[in-house]
């Protein structure tokens, strides 16, 4: 693989994607307000279409030719703890196990989000 003509860097960028990422269910969403009889919920900005759009754009402009394709893999809690504290991991697992909901900071997650992430 050739490097981009405008760089001399030998560092590479990985690209991880999976159809499962599109199955992450952010449920109905209405922004700052709770869905109600006067606030219609819609798609959260973090939805399958935004991820597909990003992947398609990366491919359409040829950026994928400069990326190292990586496959997602299941990792242990020890690995997750390198970037997330245990109380956060426990909270996300609890929300997913209860059928999904708000994981905090207006971040909705679905029942399978923990396993998909």
Feature-to-residue mapping (PLM):
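HDAC/HDAC-like amidohydrolase catalytic core signature
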Residues: 1-117
């Amino acid at each position: 693989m050739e490097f981009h003509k405008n760089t001399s860097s030998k560092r590479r960028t990985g690209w991880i994607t999976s159809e499962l990422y599109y199955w992450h269910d952010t449920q109905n969403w209405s922004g700052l307000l709770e869905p109600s009889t006067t606030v219609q919920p819609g798609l959260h900005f973090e939805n399958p279409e935004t991820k597909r759009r990003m992947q398609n754009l990366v491919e359409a402009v040829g950026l994928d030719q400069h990326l190292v394709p990586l496959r997602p893999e299941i990792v242990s809690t020890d690995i997750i703890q390198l970037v997330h504290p245990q109380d956060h991991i426990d909270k996300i697992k609890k929300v997913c196990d209860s059928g999904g909901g708000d994981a905090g900071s207006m971040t909705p997650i679905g029942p399978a989000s923990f396993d998909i992430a």
